[in-house]
């Protein structure tokens, strides 16, 4: 089965191609093409996973391009990590395909949407299967393309246009880091293959400095794609895309690609203390940073987006702390509960036609399926014990503690507190209290509810693949059994639990019971509040620094181009034409002037000759 | 200082004086007359140089023929000629450039010729150089001689073509 | 009398002729100045015929040819001048300036 | 007639036939003009496919006596014999195929030309002959001869069929390229004069063989070789164009008729790549080393300069023009790397940019034809009215910004791969251009196709729609890409994808050429 | 005296033919009734030139001949350049046949035989190995040219042209003759070979150099190169078009013939004080180089501003003289060869261009370049032919102009050290010339057509245009046609007496 792993991404690609060509004709039926294709992918992925359970790996390569003696290859490999990722991706993708059938119904570009979904799924699966950095980079960018197309799906909205452009460009900035790192690595190791790179790391071919440099450069790519600080600003804006897209791309899969990349290159990172430190610090900072912004957002999807950023920060923190397993574990659980949350949010939006939480409220009864499922997701992400998020977050906190980075540990704990607070702020504002919107809100159709139910189940169940109580299945699987669970101090779990419960309580006091006034923060620290509401002015900072600088330079160059470069050309042509008119004016029609010029010429020649004694030049 | 030297100086003086006078005069006819002096001086020099035949030709052609046709041309075209009219062209710059160039050129050449000497005294030149010239013309220089005849033909026709007033009848055609 | 004296005289006359040809306004005088230049050259030839590297009468021949050609040129030049005069009613060379630039 | 001559001169038949068609019979002219570009296409593809299956391209060499410049007793018989020589290798073959493909597509796209179609096609075919000849020539004189054919043809095509400032653009083209050619001619003259041959292979041999060195007609000192190479590089830098010699390109891109720009940006600029590789590296490998650093720096400057200027333009054609400057910088980067990857990258980038630029200008032509403007600020939301067109335009933008899976990426990857081996810091600076490329291409294309429909041109759309059905003024209708326009666009996209997905397609013919070249470079 | 009778006069057949034709035509013109058209005279003159051309071609294989102490030489050089002169003369005479005098004047039979006389002078220049003969021959050409320039008697421009030509020509003659007098004085002989031998032992290098400069300036009048180039535009503009064509081709060729004959023979081996003491010519190379460079620059740059076709072609001919002078300045082994090829190409492309300009002037009465506007519309073939000539003049490959110019380039860079600066100047000024040549193309092909279509080309002009176009194309695409002819002359091994 594993030698057929390449078919996994092929199905969505076919779906993309077919829908691009015939989608306009098929209209509604397009959905089924997409759903079937992803289902087939999922089945194939499961087959690969099953094969992988047998404990073997598989790798196949074909020549992609030859450069002299160097052969660049394309192929696929099956490792524990990517077999697992295949399933997660294919699964979430399949669910989103199903969900979209309901959510996107009635859109005139319905088939286009499915085509784009197919393209994205293909790219994501391709990325996961890549056995070498170059191929990973190719799919990495294609994933970005899929994301770009889907964010800009409502192309006629200026905001969507801007968001799509921003997403592409911000991630591109990261990608260039990846690109540079990749090419540097190539000349150090003479290969793009992960295995060759790891070998070079192992036998010291790669100098420590270069290891750190390339690792950090590649990590910049991960920062861009995973929305880590400081390249995170595109992710909230990306919420302009249709909600299923947010669920699939900006929660479960693409943004996790950064985490996956670092995980896939983990031996490279492990070899460099500095790189690990960078990853951990960026992750930790992002976790708390995004969480604070999430506190004050009023757009339901933006809150979720900042929460995603924050959670991805957790994963990075885990990686940086050396716990590769914790990262992947959290990636998995997060994929499920965040997808659930987004889909539920989509369902809410579908019902009330607004994304502003101030205009929602009291939806608990109106949305009998969505509301509890959202609650499950919220509990899971908040790390309430027995939900999946609890286990994975606990694992990360433990990893951070065990790694000795106490500051980062407490940062993560603080972030956990904030997480549970803003999630329940959201919950209470949306589902409890009085309705602040007009019109009817109806529960979504079954095609939307169904996937949410499945995800709801998984948001609880996926936690049990790696628990301190039942055993660390995931860890052993990912490390081929080498994994052994380091016993974290028991108090960490307790602290985590308390923290999450405190967060929920605070949210309840403020938004549920309203004993604490809502403008508590804004009244007490208006500047701080504004700071958060404006996302720490990061966007503005970029606008006034990077964008302004580039704009200034390009304006400067435009002047250089128009006046200096063209000016020199003008000067030359002007000189020639002035010489022409001078020469023409000198031709004054006087025969004797002509003679005089001649005689003057003769005299000059003769005099020069007489004076220099014949030694010319 | 021998007699020839004195003769040379006188003749040279006459020639140069004629030229310089020509440059100074304002009346065109006077200018031509002044140049006749130069031409005659040159003819005298030819005699000093034992070139009697050339001297004769010089007198006939330059002092005679050419001067006459020049005078004719002046008369023919002298409808509104005014002696007070400006006799030199261009502005100061033009004349200055011309003068400086000519002067510089003259000096540079003079630098070369001031002590040019081949040590020949030219005594070999036969007294009857007309015969000698004839011999050269009809043997060695036959071809250029013929060409010159063609040139004179061309000049003849050309002068007629250019100077002749086209008859009314011809123009009507 | 030495060669260089004759050559110097020729040079002076040549320069006078040249200056006159470049500055005199009346075309007839310009032409006659050119004649003067040619005459100066003839002095050279005749002087070289007597005092040159290989004295001989062929110097005279050269001078005679030069005279003939000078005459031909003078004739054609005057004819051109008369044609010009017929159309423009002037003999001033600086008024022959309709062709320029 | 032999194969290569047939390939190069087959459009001549079209020119001759066209001469007999009535001026007003535009249908026949379009048909004939397009058909005339097909034989070279078929022949080129035939050669390409055959070469893939082990056919040795040397067998196609042709050589006939043409002129014997000097027949002095102290020269050998072979000296100063200039022959009519054509010959190709993998490198030329790639460019010939590119030319032939774009030639046909440009002829198809010339549907949009409305005036003086007869003359237009005659010169277009002449241009194609010139371009094919440039790549097929095996000797310097004939290379130059064909090069000047393109110069004259382009001058007329731009000057007569271009936009408002067409004559200025044509003169700009003429002067810059004329100067480049003139410089090239001096270099050619020196080489021919001092070696007595114009044949590439013989020149190569003579210049590298120390025994032959003594047989030179006049010596070529080491210093002279640097000057010669400098002259060559400068000449081709004008044609590339390298900053700051790029102003003509901008004007030509804007003013020339779009099908002509397809050929201009698609092929003519690539003559510079070809020339730099064939003559620069081919004839003066040792001297090239000394220039490599400067070339690489210039390449990076080109990339950034072009990209930063493209950011500011409000005219789509200007954006594309500066993007051409930027993309040709990648070629320089590859050459400056002076390793296999770099050279291969330069070639790849040339081919890729050829295809992409052709696609862009095909679409620009359609846009100008439909809306009457290509001003970004006056456009917007076009995806609604012209979804298929917008899709192609978006593809073009993605290709421009070097999206993997499309041709542009392969070129940039290989070129930068090359430079990262030799000058990593410089390469990293150049890689920043990738970001700007994304910014300018997305800005331009998204502003045209995405967002609100701008009021300013809504009336245009409405007006056009009104002509068809008076009732539907409220819903503006513009004709989307039609089949005859979509076909060339689709072919180009297909090629761009093909090259992007499987670059080995291009790498294979290049392999032997590169090997020879690397031997010349001493490993 | 015996020499005269024993000389091999048959070697002068071409000259005899031309002279006889001229005399016969002159007599016919005299006796012909006044009202009869004189046009057939021009055809007769052209026939005479063609006959002479055939006679010259027939003599190509003959051994070099010298008559009367080299006053007439028939070596490879003479034959080669006579071919060009006669071809140019014949083509110019075709233009004469279709000359349309304007402004109330009438067609003049003198035109034809005056041109033959001028041609005779040019031919004799090519054939002379004697200073005096050279002088007299070139004067025959010059004096005839004065008359040709003034033939449009009723037109002020033509009178003025003749007058300016005479004045400047007179000054040039005097300067040249002054130089010749010193050469004669230093050597005491007029035979070029003897002069060269005498000069090798001269101890007056300074005077010799002065003589060199005087001769150079004198000759530069005939070549119309800097500094004696300024008369050319005025005279070219004022003279009748066929005469202008003749001046720009035949006179210029004769000038270069004179240049080669005089300078190469006399000064190549003369001692000097300069950088190359063994050769005055080589040590004066920088002077010629500078003059050539200036000529190219001035000719091409000033041409940019011209609106009159004749004037534009005048400046272009100055520029071409510059290219040729550069070829001379290089002094490579290819010097004479490359000048010959260039002049041959120049005959075809320039007379072709003038033929069409003549038609435009005949038809529109003006030579403003707007007269070309839209020619392509009405007369596509004519426009194409003019386009070809212009491209050739610009030196675009595929035309004679390119082959010729390329050979000049070879000559410039093959020497050691090479004349790279001069080559670059030549290349750059060529590009400058693109502007004005292509400006004419713009008129031809881009501008809207004028209202009245031109009449068809008359027989003489169309013959000239066809022949010139064929020549331009043939040399451009099959250069061996020209090079094979050139090879017949054995690369002028018998040039030096």
From Swiss-Prot, chain C:
Keyword Membrane: yes
Its EC number(s): 7.1.1.-
Principal EC category: translocase
Domain of life: Bacteria
Predominant localisation class: membrane
GO CC annotation, single: plasma membrane
Membrane spanning residue stretches: 2-22, 28-48, 62-82
Subcellular location: Cell membrane
GO molecular function annotation: NADH:ubiquinone reductase (non-electrogenic) activity; quinone binding
UniProt KW keywords: Cell membrane, Membrane, NAD, Quinone, Translocase, Transmembrane, Transmembrane helix, Transport
Subunit annotation: NDH-1 is composed of 14 different subunits. Subunits NuoA, H, J, K, L, M, N constitute the membrane sector of the complex.
Biological role: NDH-1 shuttles electrons from NADH, via FMN and iron-sulfur (Fe-S) centers, to quinones in the respiratory chain. The immediate electron acceptor for the enzyme in this species is believed to be a menaquinone. Couples the redox reaction to proton translocation (for every two electrons transferred, four hydrogen ions are translocated across the cytoplasmic membrane), and thus conserves the redox energy in a proton gradient.
Protein name, entry field: NADH-quinone oxidoreductase subunit K
Organism whose genome encodes this protein: Geobacillus thermodenitrificans (strain NG80-2)
